[in-house]
Structures are given as C-alpha cells and as structure tokens.
Amino acid sequence: MYKRQQAWSGDVVSDWGVLRNQISAALNLSLTGIPYWNSDIGGFFSANKFPEGVKDPAFHELYVRWMQFATFTGMMRSHGTNTPREIFMFGERGYWAFDAQEKMINLRYRLLPYIYSTSWKITSEGESLMRALFSDFPEDKEVLDLGDEYLFGKSILVAPVTSETRSRSLYLPAGTRWIDFWTGEVQDGGCEITRETPVDIIPLYVKAGSIIPVGPTVQFATEKSWDDLQLRIYPGANGEFTLYEDEDDNYNYEKGKYSTIRMTWNDKERKLTIHPRQGNYNGMLQERKFHIVLVNGQDGLGLDNESYTVNVEYQGKKINIKLP
C-alpha cells in the first residue's frame, strides 16, 4: 500500500482556514507511511462562502493560492461542485487569476523530472514526497511545531500562502543555506524571514547543494522527450541527485526496465559530475543535452529563465563539468 496509495482530503469546503489545515493533514498522512496526498483545489463545496463562484474575485484569490499549494503535492487536481473550475472560466490570459494558474500549471510540468525521480525514491527506498521539516532537520527544535511549511522532495521548501495577504513569515531550518527559487537571493538557515507574496508567488526556497532537473513546457506529460533538460545547481554545499526514467505508462520498471543517472556536485571544486547511466528500457534516449545552470542572482531563476552556464552532450558515459 505504501508505494501506490493515493489519498485525498475529502469533500472539503472553500475556506481559508480549511486551506491552512490541508498542509498539516498532508504531512500527518505522509508520516503514517502514505506518500501521495492531494486535495480538491479551491475546495469541493464553494456555495456557502462564495455563492457567486468564479464570478467572485475573492474566490479567485483562494483558488489561486490553493493551486499554488497543490502544485507541490502528490497530485495536482482541480475538482468540485457549485461552480466551474476550468482555467478559462476565470477570465482570459492577461487577467491575474488566469495568469497565476497558468504559471503554476507550467511549473508543475517543468518540475516533472524532479517529481518523477523523487517518486522512484518512494518506490525503491521508501522516501516521502511531502516531508515534515523535522524529518530532515531533527536537531532544529524550531521546526517541531511548524505545520504550514514542508519539503517537497529533499530540496524544495514550500511555504504556502493561506490568507488574503501579500506577505508571510516563514522559518528556514538551520544547518544549511537557502536560495529563493524566484529571485536567487541567498538566506542563512536558522532564522525567520518575511517574504513578499504577490498573488502569483508562493514562497519556495531551495536547499544549498541541490541539483534540480527542469523539463520543457508542455501541455501533457509525454508531449516532449527529456532530451534537453536544464540542470539547476544551487551552490553553497555538496549535493547529489539521481535522474530516473522509464517507459512512462506501464509496469515494466518492476522487471528492471528503467534507467538512472546519478549526478554529484562538489561545491569547493565547482565541479558537476554526471556519472555513467545505469539500466536500459525500450525507447531510452541514447544521447541528450544537459543545459547546466549555476543559479545566482540572474541565472536559473523562476519558471521561464532559459539561460545556462554550460551546455554538454551526454551519451551515457561519465563526464565532469567545471563551472565558474
């Protein structure tokens, strides 16, 4: 059950307090050994608090914030009654609620290499996708009571906005440095900060030493191959990541039909090592490009930053890349 269970929080109502409670509910379920969790974006029942539904800008804001949170759960899923939920029912491109939703949908798709590889760690090693902070920072007592922040995988700290506000305070765990996903600003851990949160921004902080693979912008998961992934290196510590791939839509991985590519970052030497590919499966890419980005205040920021530090060809053999 642990490897495949997908739970949801039930037919909850559209309410800011309910949105806040979704975070701790997800983390509690993850701690019981069920790694995949989701909720109805915007709440299932909206008529009580928002009788006008998608005609009400107040519902738009709650829905957008809920979608931002859902982007970093086991399944990103919109579902409900009383009012339509399709993105085009909120307006057109150029309207803030439409644009903020499109931004999160694109981000979810672009993070699929990271999410899919993390899911393999769940299957093969029993890891979790939504991680309570004390699981990874047991020596930091400040995280013991934090129920509104979490790690998504081992690298991305998520601090959802759960009220009608344009800023929120959050705590960055001690023992590492953190890099703002959107701006590249570096913060020392072990402190509370205040982050501005315009309606299209959810606070995201990446742990120093992380390697995050970023895929193409797509309309569905398998629309484009992963033959030119961006690899974002967040400096400040050593780190590693294993990219997992398989045939996408069957159980052949249970028969060993998959591949892994281990990547390691040596921060002192500023060296990325992409190790030999392990495994094989039908349709596996024999060669590909990696666009490697050393994240700083300009490069590797947010969703659409396509700049890169160096471009390499990879054919399954070990390569070392020295970065400035």
Where on the chain are the PLM-derived regions?
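Catalytic-domain carbohydrate-binding cleft regions of carbohydrate-active enzymes
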Residues: 3-201, 206-207
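Accessory, solvent-exposed terminal regions and/or long lumenal/extracellular loops of proteins
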Residues: 201-320, 324
